[in-house]
Amino acid sequence: MKSEFTRAKAHATLTSGEVIRMLRELKGWTQQELSDRSGINATNISPLENERIDIGKKRAEQLAKAFDVHPAIIMFPEYEAAEMKRAA
């Protein structure tokens, strides 16, 4: 019997800014708290989350340390999505 359903395709890809916001919200932190924990100026947190400024290696490392994750998770969020797509 042929299935009536087709396999879903992955559509959601996250930007670095979306990953930063998601991690911050999962921790229950305000932007000021993230600033305090990462050492990144509070005025730069919103622009980072909204992709108005480039993250760069140094900021990615600071954020990764604050979130206790590998910097690649922040800098290359599309990599994991590509790996999952290839495995499907």
Sequence positions of predicted segments:
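Short, charged recognition helix plus adjacent turn
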Residues: 1-10, 65, 75-88
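A short, Lys/Arg-rich alpha-helix, primarily the initiator
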Residues: 2-26
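Short basic helix-loop element that most often maps to the first helix and adjoining turn
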Residues: 18-37, 62
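Residue-level recognition of specific faces of alpha-helices
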Residues: 19, 44-47, 73
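Recognition helix of helix-turn-helix/homeodomain-like DNA-binding domains
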Residues: 39-55
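Short, solvent-exposed alpha-helical "recognition" segments
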Residues: 52-57, 83-85
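DNA major-groove recognition helix of helix-turn-helix/homeodomain DNA-binding modules
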Residues: 58-73
